[in-house]
């Protein structure tokens, strides 16, 4: 039974009502060689080579799939540099000097409505694979693998819930590109031969609700409907969203496709629209840069590969207190990763950068055994027991506590009265459990 949900402090008002600033022409762009799912990669270009926007310039390798690396602007490859990736690790990045011509690779082409209507699921699978489309809500799971399912799909769910505090990138995307999202939903319905889709948002998003009710009315397509879910965290977790939207409760580890459901994030839908309509990979995305450490929190639409340093001073006004130590979080405060500096590159799956003044008074205290972490866990784990097992290096105990069920929602750390980063201990436990 999914019942352990909670209200968390909402800080979206900092930027939620602000339109996204377009910043698409930085002097240099940086493309990650590897990522969390693809630890190895080959480079197809050498220093001094000219590249086109959307050109395949390398190939990432995972255990069971390969993933093309695309240039996100036209220009000259000038070398390799190390920067922080969204996983919090220093990673090799391909550095491209922008020529500001935005010359597109010949592979980019606009398909006619007739050509799109003729595409099969197999055709679309190949397109999204070649465009390296992944889950853009942060999961980075290859979209083409979802398209390869042989299970019959009778419901497509679009996740526009964005339950993390601070982040409003998807909110702005939904308001600014609604027609692209609706068209992409139709492409997915065509691929899966599915006649029902729901766009899931939080019930408090009145502006999105108004926009989509009008658009769906104009489209006159009753196969797609809006689904307003409760204002809880972690309502964006696919298990909770599916339960709320369909009444179906997935078993632990069960894939949604086993129940005839396929779910996508709204950002992934815009990526699907670009891939199907223009044969174009993801070269731009919406992000939120916010937090109490900067003067002007903003939403942006940027090229993938942009350094946040290019945005902080010019658009965000710099730091409010430059002399203070900062906390930099890639992603949301609940599930994101911290990095030690602002040397951060925006990759395809970066949804936000949160910059906070470090609070040195927020010191971890001994556990008081209050049970808050246990009560708040949406998958019914015992985080405090997992933490104690990790501290004792008791691998057998760790495995019995089943930390692999953890979805890393961060509620155990959020609710901890002793300010213990319980989620970090559970992450370590997951590593031990896999050994």
Set out the residue ranges of the language-model regions:
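Extended boundary segments
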Residues: 1-22, 79, 84-85, 249-252, ...
């Amino acid at each position: 039974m999914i019942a352990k949900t909670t209200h968390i402090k909402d800080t979206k008002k900092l930027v939620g009502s602000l339109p996204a600033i377009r910043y698409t022409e930085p002097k240099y762009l940086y493309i990650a060689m590897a990522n969390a799912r693809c630890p190895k990669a080959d480079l197809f270009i050498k220093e001094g080579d000219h590249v086109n926007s959307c050109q395949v310039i390398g190939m990432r390798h995972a255990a069971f799939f390969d993933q093309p690396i695309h240039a996100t602007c036209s220009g000259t490859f000038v070398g390799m540099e190390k920067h922080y990736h969204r996983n919090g690790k220093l990673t090799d990045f391909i550095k491209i000097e922008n020529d500001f011509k935005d010359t597109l690779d010949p592979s980019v082409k606009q398909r006619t409505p007739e050509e799109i209507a003729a595409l099969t699921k197999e055709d679309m699978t190949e397109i999204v694979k070649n465009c390296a489309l992944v889950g853009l809500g942060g999961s980075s799971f290859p979209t083409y693998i979802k398209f390869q399912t042989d299970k019959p799909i009778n419901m497509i769910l679009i996740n526009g819930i964005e339950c993390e505090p601070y982040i409003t990138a998807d909110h702005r995307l939904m308001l600014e590109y609604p027609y692209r999202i609706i068209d992409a939903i139709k492409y997915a319905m065509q691929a899966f031969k599915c006649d029902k889709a729901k766009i899931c948002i939080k019930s408090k998003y009145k502006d999105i609700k108004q926009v989509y009710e009008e658009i769906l009315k104009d489209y006159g397509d009753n196969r797609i409907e809006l689904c307003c879910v409760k204002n809880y965290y972690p309502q964006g977790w696919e298990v909770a969203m599916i339960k709320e939207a369909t009444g179906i409760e997935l078993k632990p580890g069960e894939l949604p496709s086993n129940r005839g459901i396929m779910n996508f994030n709204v950002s992934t839908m815009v990526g699907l629209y670009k891939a199907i309509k223009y044969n174009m990979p993801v070269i731009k995305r919406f992000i939120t840069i916010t937090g109490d450490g900067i003067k002007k929190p903003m939403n942006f639409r940027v090229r993938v590969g942009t350094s946040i340093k290019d945005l902080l001073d010019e658009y965000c006004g710099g730091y409010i207190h430059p002399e203070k130590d900062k906390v930099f979080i890639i992603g949301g405060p609940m599930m994101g990763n911290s990095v030690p500096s602002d040397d951060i590159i925006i990759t395809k799956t970066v949804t936000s950068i949160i910059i906070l003044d470090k609070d040195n008074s927020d010191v971890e205290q001994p556990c008081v055994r209050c049970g808050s972490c246990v009560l708040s866990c949406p998958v019914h784990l015992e985080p405090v027991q997992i933490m104690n097992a990790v501290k004792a290096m008791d691998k057998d105990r760790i495995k019995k506590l089943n930390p692999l069920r953890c979805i890393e929602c961060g509620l155990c750390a959020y609710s901890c009265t002793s300010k213990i980063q319980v989620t970090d201990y559970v992450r370590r436990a997951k590593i031990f459990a896999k050994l």
